[in-house]
Regions:
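Single conserved hydrophobic/aromatic residue that forms the stacking wall/gate
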Residues: 1-14
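Zinc-dependent deaminase catalytic domain
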Residues: 12-164
Length: 164
């Protein structure tokens, strides 16, 4: 649920400041949420915005099939077909940056879900130094162990993780 729905702008800023979320964190998380709506996955929509040290957007991504691969209902509604084929939002953002020659070193990744181990290793290897995701996200039980492992990967690699 969107905790800020229906709240005035002044109140939103006060809530964000009180809980340690800057207006920039709020903006980039909201943008990641908007980008997540571009996903055609019927069960999960995830968005990612990667931001440089000067608050410039370096790359964005959402979960979906690779370029040129038709996203049919049959593929998207069958996990056995979908999972091996789909690119996660973080992967899409990283691959888009690589495709266009943009460095993600020392950037912050704003994501609508905690990164899985697959995305954690990619974010770490890309040089992303901080991950921010909403604290109110409900995680399906089937993902809990994977997300716990990704948090351990981030901790060991000294990648900062913030739940906002």
């Amino acid at each position: 649920p969107d905790w800020s729905r229906g709240l005035g702008d002044v109140y939103k800023r006060q809530v964000c400041i009180r809980y340690g979320m800057s207006k920039w964190d709020q903006r980039f998380l909201e943008l990641a949420k908007q980008i997540s709506t571009w996903s055609k996955d019927p069960s999960t929509q995830v968005g990612c915005v990667v931001v440089g040290p000067d608050r410039e957007i370096r790359s964005t991504g959402f979960n979906g099939l690779p370029r040129g691969i038709e996203d049919t209902s049959e593929r998207l509604n069958n996990r056995e077909i979908k999972y091996p084929m789909i690119c996660h939002a973080e992967e899409n953002a990283i691959m888009h940056a690589a495709r266009t020659g943009i460095s993600l070193k020392n950037c912050v990744a704003y994501v609508t879900w905690p990164p899985c181990t697959r995305c954690a290793r990619s974010l770490i290897q890309a040089g992303v130094s901080e991950i921010v995701y909403p604290k109110e996200v409900e995680i399906p039980e089937r993902w809990e162990a994977d997300f716990d492992m990704s948090l351990n990967m981030f901790k060991e690699s000294k990648t900062l993780v913030r739940k906002e």
